[in-house]
Amino acid sequence: PGQVKLIFQPAEEGAPPGEEGGAELMVKEGVLKNPDVDAIFGLHVWSGLYAGQVYLRPEGIMAAVNEFRIDLKGVQTHGSTPWTGKDPIVTAAQIVNSLQTIVSRSLPLTEAGAVVTIGSIHGGVRSNIIPEDLYMLGTIRTLDNGMKATVLKRLEEIVYNVAKSNNIEANITYLVSYPITFNDPYLYEEILPTLERVNGKKNVHLMKAITGAEDFSYFQEKVPGTYFFIGGQKTDVDLSTVAPHHTPDFYVDDSAISTGIRSMVGLTLDYIFNN
């Protein structure tokens, strides 16, 4: 005998700016209490894998994410006399290039992966005016907490020192932040036979960690958990032609639903009867 709690979570992709949401808020509001949760399981469909296939790994399976905003403030001037102002655009270019040295020159990449990406730059309105203000938006993905600390430290060193060298004011604001999605190794070993039994051993695969992120990690910070992926593509489709997630042509075949149901029901029943 045991109890099963189903969590219906909003805002998996993050709450609107300035608001709380998703798994972090649910944990704060007591979703893992009354009754207390002993273990948690989650899954994610993947369009680039064949339906009927299950992929997982022990320990880190998805990266931590730290999204950030960099604000630069200079002195506006005419583009024909740049020496009369302070140029945030040139400074931004230097910062973007320098940030790419964090991964290539400051991290032991044979141990774990990391990504630093600037995805958006906003500044200026005319070709012949150097603007006063500029801001950039970026994301950091790390698969190791030590690397995460190093990347954040180097980010601040680079931004503030490059800005200072150009007489520019700089400020970093941290936005969305998710921990590493970490599969408890003991729970992983306990549930692996279940997944192999209900799906067929040949259909369950050990995967490499990926640099996507998932706020399911907030649940795993509180209780042992395992997160895994199921395929969602027809077996007669060339996977190299499949549209990725978050694109207009994204498609998942309905046959994936049975894999998900079979896996979650099997995990739930086996965990309850074995514990």
Q: Which residues fall in each region the model found?
A:
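Histidine/acidic-residue-rich, glycine-tolerant segments that coordinate divalent metal ions
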Residues: 1-120, 125-131
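Metal-dependent amide/peptide-bond hydrolase catalytic core
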Residues: 93-275
